[in-house]
């Protein structure tokens, strides 16, 4: 019996969870599960529970399903589980059970065509907790099949001990079927980005559980501020994806601000769990300082790149202006007439150092390839292979000078003249042997070497070289005067071999740098006097330019041929084997090197003669 001064009543201690549970059909053949409590978690599961207040004793409890809206009518869905029959739960409890827990209750839904039959069954069983008129019970049009409520009824014993005294029924919160989009739990599964500009307008792709496109919105909330994402019904894809644009924030910010983003259903004001969204400050550069910095940086990099790669300093229409030190320019820059500035690089030298920088003006060849008569001495035909390329046309800017004094032979042994282009890898006799007509004009005077018939001595050993190309005229003298020896016969059967070092660049051709001079016959060394060496360089240019015979002249067009070359002076036996001399024959044999010449600074004879020991023979 009831105890206390107050009437007993029912109080729900634990409400059922409203969302997250799926209603099962009978045909699915599986249990409908258990209705969890409102505060249930994975680690601490709870279930709906009630407590009878102001009463201690035994009784009976009945649980049925009713509709969502008032008046609460019996619902066609069934309640299934332990102690359930005909779609409702009923069980007695004793005095020791307080409170009452219901952990084996499930909801099984019926098909739409079975709704009316299920309602009639409830009426026959007397399941009408709120005594709704039968006429209203038969009206099933307003019945929502996706939402139910639990109705708790308690019966206490009467005077005769029968459990007939009913306490006022109590209904729980609505329970929604998780399959229905209009009642399902709202949940944000994933977004493609969780930050955006404070000005809004960022496009976001949001994945979610099933929603209704006409009953859903995206809400941004922070304290008292609220805004909605911008999208239309066409932006809801198959009820599981929403594409929207973020709304602008309420004010300008200087630091990121985090707000809450959530889904909300307007029909029942249901909201999802919130997700953080961060508004970023506007990074717009009002004065364009960032663009200016980028432009300045790019311009500076371009200037540095142009200076390093090209090094262009000045363009001269007359030719190529180039520092003597450094690597030579490319072929493309030479042909375009472009001036290239290379950094100065010191070079060691035996006879002096190169100045701060000199300018070389590129000039064409003196002689054309057609002007050279292709005839070779019979004795050296195997040694005179073509080596240098054919020269191009050249202006006749050099004056014609008289021929030198006649020399004893018209044929000379082949002498190798390696240049920087040849890499100094050719043998001693790997140069071309060519002749030039006697009436050739514009031959450099310092390169003329006459060949005559009046010097036919068999013991004559002839050698000629230039030690100051710019400051002197053509050099020619008899063999006796050439060597500064009173008796020319002392040089008979004396083979002379002179070696020079090759120059590294075109700009250093004025440094002969003679290394050795070997007179193979010991008798030659015995008659040479150091004073004779100095006498050789003190000869006047007027005496060296004597001679009027315009015989065929053997020449070398480039002064650097004397540098980096191996000179060999043949004795009388080799000179005689080359054939008879003919001073009037325009096809007289000689050797020639086809190239271009460069203007070269002069070198004092005093420095040249004093730079070597007395046993070296300088010419």
Swiss-Prot record:
Residues carrying N-acetylalanine: 2
Biological processes per GO annotation: canonical NF-kappaB signal transduction; inflammatory response; innate immune response; negative regulation of gene expression; negative regulation of interferon-beta production; non-canonical NF-kappaB signal transduction; positive regulation of canonical NF-kappaB signal transduction; positive regulation of transcription by RNA polymerase II
Gene Ontology CC annotation, any one: cytosol
Keyword Disulfide bond among record annotations: no
Modified residues (Phosphoserine): 267, 503
Region spans: Disordered: 399-437, 572-593
Spans traversing the lipid bilayer: none
Motif Nuclear localization signal mapped to chain: 290-295
Pfam families (alphabetical): RHD_dimer, RHD_DNA_bind
Biased composition annotated in UniProt, kind: Low complexity: 399-420
RHD domain mapped to chain residues: 8-297
Compartmental location: Nucleus
Extent of Polar residues compositional bias: 421-437
Keyword match Transcription: yes
Keywords: Acetylation, Activator, DNA-binding, Nucleus, Phosphoprotein, Proto-oncogene, Transcription, Transcription regulation
A GO MF term: RNA polymerase II cis-regulatory region sequence-specific DNA binding
Free-text function comment from the UniProt entry: Proto-oncogene that may play a role in differentiation and lymphopoiesis. NF-kappa-B is a pleiotropic transcription factor which is present in almost all cell types and is involved in many biological processed such as inflammation, immunity, differentiation, cell growth, tumorigenesis and apoptosis. NF-kappa-B is a homo- or heterodimeric complex formed by the Rel-like domain-containing proteins RELA/p65, RELB, NFKB1/p105, NFKB1/p50, REL and NFKB2/p52.
Quaternary structure and interacting proteins, as annotated: Component of the NF-kappa-B p65-c-Rel complex. Component of the NF-kappa-B p50-c-Rel complex. Component of the NF-kappa-B p52-c-Rel complex. Homodimer; component of the NF-kappa-B c-Rel-c-Rel complex. Interacts with NKIRAS1. Interacts with NFKBIB. Interacts with NFKBIE.
Record's disease association: Immunodeficiency 92: An autosomal recessive disorder characterized by recurrent bacterial, viral, fungal, or parasitic infections appearing in infancy or early childhood. Patient lymphocytes show defects in both T- and B-cell proliferation, cytokine secretion, and overall function, and there is also evidence of dysfunction of NK, certain antigen-presenting cells, and myeloid subsets.
Designated name of the protein: Proto-oncogene c-Rel
